[in-house]
Amino acid sequence: MFDILMYLFENYVHSEVELLVDEDELTKELTRAGFHQSEILKALTWLERLAELQESDKPYLCNHDQHSFRIYTKEEMEKLDVECRGFLLFLEQVKVLNVETREMVIDRVMELDEPALILEDLKWVILMVLFNAPGHESAYEQMEDLIFEQPEEGRLHS
C-alpha cells in the first residue's frame, strides 16, 4: 500500500499533474502500473481518510496545553521507533508540525499496513499530510526542504 501512495504522490501530486478524479480510471492506471487491486483499494481508502481528517471535528485536540508532551501508545511505539518519534518532536519544536498535524500524521501512520516505519517513510507520510492540510503551505515547503536537501555533516536531522 505504501508503494502505491508513493507512486501517486510522486507521479500526480508532487509533479503537479492533475490527479484523475475518477476512481475507476485511477484504479485502472495503477493496475497497469503493476499494483494489485486489493492494495490499490487500501491506498485509496487511506487517502480518503486523510481527506476526512481535514473535515472532521477533533475534540481530542481542543483542550491541549501548549507545553504538553505526547505520550505514545504501545502500538504507536511499535510502529514508530525512537528515531521516528524524535523526528516528530523535532518537527514540532521547529514549528513544521503542530498538535493537529502531528496527530494526523500518527493517525495515517497507524493505518499503514507496515509493521514498523523507517524514518524516510515517515518523512513522506508527513509530506502527504501537510500537502493535504489547508493553511500549512509553509510547513509543507519546510518539510520538502528537509526531504530533498543534501544532509550536511554533523546535522542532527535531515
From Swiss-Prot:
Top-level lineage group: Bacteria
Pfam families: DUF494
HAMAP family, alphabetized: Smg
Similarity remark: Belongs to the Smg family.
NCBIfam families recorded: PRK03430.1
Descriptive protein name: Protein Smg homolog
Organism expressing this protein natively: Shewanella sp. (strain ANA-3)
Gene coding for it: smg
